[in-house]
Amino acid sequence: MIRYISAMPSPEWEHETPRTLALLGSTGSIGTSALRVVEAHPHRFKVVALAGARNVEKLAAQAARWRPEHLGVLDATGAAKLRDLLPAGYAPHIHIGPEGYATMATLPEAGTVLSAQVGAAGLRATEAAARHGKVICLANKESLVLAGDIIRRHCAGSGAVILPVDSEHNAIFQALQGHDPASVRRIILTASGGPFRGRSRDDLAAVSCRDALAHPNWNMGAKISIDSATLMNKGLEVIEACHLYGVGIDDVGVVVHPQSIVHSLVEYEDGSQIAHLGTPDMRIAIAYCLTWPGVVDAGVPRLDLVKAGSLTFEEPDLHSFPCLELARRAYREGRGMPVVLNAANEVAVSLFLSDRIRFLDIPDIIARALDMHDGTTPHDIEGIEALDEATRRTVYERAGHSNTDGMA
């Protein structure tokens, strides 16, 4: 039985033109793709806010093109640099840090918020948008991994709408349209398998960061590329599915599909399955969310099944890639474990990207963090942030490094 996380927009929302957008994470892969969609359909959208993190030069270029009234950066140093880079005579309001991002997510002039910041740093803004009744195009899966129950309650109270940008969850969302929620038997997420599909643990012992970043199908940022290589990305998506669709962890299956053509499937009680197919390009899902319930040309190459050739599927290798099962464990056990899982993973990925640990150390670090968790169960955003910070500090200390990352 599907119980979606939020209501859908009222019918008149379809005719809102232009849609007013706050793009949080505009300098990343998702944000850049979103602006390409906006560029292709300028009459449909008005960009009122753009937020990046450390890539101030790119944010300045975006701001010069779109001239939003609000910009967001990570810190005061970035804000000063941004002001110097903006065109003469253009003086938008600049918001700083997580609180600034959250303020941007609640701007009265922004009807739709694209939550595309990387990792736990996107939680505050997503939670704020949910409290204020926004239409949220959600790419930041960590928001639901960390605070799915809280965000569901906010949506129920405010009328906020969540539309999933993740290609897999967008596929599920589309496959559910027009069907009785009670007729759904299970959800099946597809995974590409990443750049190391078919490798043994012995093979993985010597892989480099550069190897892990070379995804065979998708153009993604560094953090999600590593998550794809470890299968943690799919683990987080399994947890996300439980919150988005109100299903149990055992009702969410995962199959490896190396071609990344079938984005996910829904199985119904009659034994049938409905799949969503398309070219592996995030603009399809982004355009679908930004214009829902309408459909526009996303600007991607058309899928030709004859040229695509064979579509194959296989079971994930949980021995070589244990992160998927670690995510399932964290969700089953609850008691703050998903927060610990995500924090430990973000630290481990950061250490790997800076060549301070090996690839196979990533799941080991996460497993140790889960084993050490004392059962603390956060009940609000402040509690989640406190557990996140404590976990990061512990993981860094055990790894022999200083804590330089966090939810900010």
Curated annotation (Swiss-Prot):
<protein>
    <recommendedName>
        <fullName>1-deoxy-D-xylulose 5-phosphate reductoisomerase</fullName>
        <ecNumber>1.1.1.267</ecNumber>
    </recommendedName>
</protein>
<feature type="binding site">
    <location>
        <position position="168"/>
    </location>
    <ligand>
        <name>Mn(2+)</name>
    </ligand>
</feature>
<feature type="binding site">
    <location>
        <position position="29"/>
    </location>
    <ligand>
        <name>NADPH</name>
    </ligand>
</feature>
<dbReference type="Pfam" id="PF08436">
    <property type="entry name" value="DXP_redisom_C"/>
</dbReference>
<feature type="binding site">
    <location>
        <position position="192"/>
    </location>
    <ligand>
        <name>1-deoxy-D-xylulose 5-phosphate</name>
    </ligand>
</feature>
<feature type="binding site">
    <location>
        <position position="27"/>
    </location>
    <ligand>
        <name>NADPH</name>
    </ligand>
</feature>
<dbReference type="InterPro" id="IPR026877">
    <property type="entry name" value="DXPR_C"/>
</dbReference>
<feature type="binding site">
    <location>
        <position position="237"/>
    </location>
    <ligand>
        <name>Mn(2+)</name>
    </ligand>
</feature>
<comment type="function">
    <text>Catalyzes the NADPH-dependent rearrangement and reduction of 1-deoxy-D-xylulose-5-phosphate (DXP) to 2-C-methyl-D-erythritol 4-phosphate (MEP).</text>
</comment>
<feature type="binding site">
    <location>
        <position position="221"/>
    </location>
    <ligand>
        <name>NADPH</name>
    </ligand>
</feature>
<feature type="binding site">
    <location>
        <position position="142"/>
    </location>
    <ligand>
        <name>NADPH</name>
    </ligand>
</feature>
<dbReference type="InterPro" id="IPR013644">
    <property type="entry name" value="DXP_reductoisomerase_C"/>
</dbReference>
<feature type="binding site">
    <location>
        <position position="167"/>
    </location>
    <ligand>
        <name>1-deoxy-D-xylulose 5-phosphate</name>
    </ligand>
</feature>
<dbReference type="GO" id="GO:0030145">
    <property type="term" value="F:manganese ion binding"/>
</dbReference>
<dbReference type="GO" id="GO:0051484">
    <property type="term" value="P:isopentenyl diphosphate biosynthetic process, methylerythritol 4-phosphate pathway involved in terpenoid biosynthetic process"/>
</dbReference>
<keyword id="KW-0560">Oxidoreductase</keyword>
<feature type="binding site">
    <location>
        <position position="54"/>
    </location>
    <ligand>
        <name>NADPH</name>
    </ligand>
</feature>
<dbReference type="InterPro" id="IPR003821">
    <property type="entry name" value="DXP_reductoisomerase"/>
</dbReference>
<comment type="pathway">
    <text>Isoprenoid biosynthesis; isopentenyl diphosphate biosynthesis via DXP pathway; isopentenyl diphosphate from 1-deoxy-D-xylulose 5-phosphate: step 1/6.</text>
</comment>
<keyword id="KW-0464">Manganese</keyword>
<feature type="binding site">
    <location>
        <position position="140"/>
    </location>
    <ligand>
        <name>NADPH</name>
    </ligand>
</feature>
<dbReference type="GO" id="GO:0030604">
    <property type="term" value="F:1-deoxy-D-xylulose-5-phosphate reductoisomerase activity"/>
</dbReference>
<feature type="binding site">
    <location>
        <position position="234"/>
    </location>
    <ligand>
        <name>1-deoxy-D-xylulose 5-phosphate</name>
    </ligand>
</feature>
<feature type="binding site">
    <location>
        <position position="228"/>
    </location>
    <ligand>
        <name>1-deoxy-D-xylulose 5-phosphate</name>
    </ligand>
</feature>
<feature type="binding site">
    <location>
        <position position="166"/>
    </location>
    <ligand>
        <name>Mn(2+)</name>
    </ligand>
</feature>
<keyword id="KW-0414">Isoprene biosynthesis</keyword>
<feature type="binding site">
    <location>
        <position position="55"/>
    </location>
    <ligand>
        <name>NADPH</name>
    </ligand>
</feature>
<feature type="binding site">
    <location>
        <position position="237"/>
    </location>
    <ligand>
        <name>1-deoxy-D-xylulose 5-phosphate</name>
    </ligand>
</feature>
<feature type="binding site">
    <location>
        <position position="53"/>
    </location>
    <ligand>
        <name>NADPH</name>
    </ligand>
</feature>
<feature type="binding site">
    <location>
        <position position="28"/>
    </location>
    <ligand>
        <name>NADPH</name>
    </ligand>
</feature>
<dbReference type="InterPro" id="IPR013512">
    <property type="entry name" value="DXP_reductoisomerase_N"/>
</dbReference>
<dbReference type="InterPro" id="IPR036291">
    <property type="entry name" value="NAD(P)-bd_dom_sf"/>
</dbReference>
<dbReference type="InterPro" id="IPR036169">
    <property type="entry name" value="DXPR_C_sf"/>
</dbReference>
<dbReference type="Pfam" id="PF13288">
    <property type="entry name" value="DXPR_C"/>
</dbReference>
<feature type="binding site">
    <location>
        <position position="215"/>
    </location>
    <ligand>
        <name>1-deoxy-D-xylulose 5-phosphate</name>
    </ligand>
</feature>
<dbReference type="Pfam" id="PF02670">
    <property type="entry name" value="DXP_reductoisom"/>
</dbReference>
<feature type="binding site">
    <location>
        <position position="168"/>
    </location>
    <ligand>
        <name>1-deoxy-D-xylulose 5-phosphate</name>
    </ligand>
</feature>
<feature type="binding site">
    <location>
        <position position="233"/>
    </location>
    <ligand>
        <name>1-deoxy-D-xylulose 5-phosphate</name>
    </ligand>
</feature>
<feature type="binding site">
    <location>
        <position position="141"/>
    </location>
    <ligand>
        <name>1-deoxy-D-xylulose 5-phosphate</name>
    </ligand>
</feature>
<keyword id="KW-0521">NADP</keyword>
<feature type="binding site">
    <location>
        <position position="30"/>
    </location>
    <ligand>
        <name>NADPH</name>
    </ligand>
</feature>
<comment type="similarity">
    <text>Belongs to the DXR family.</text>
</comment>
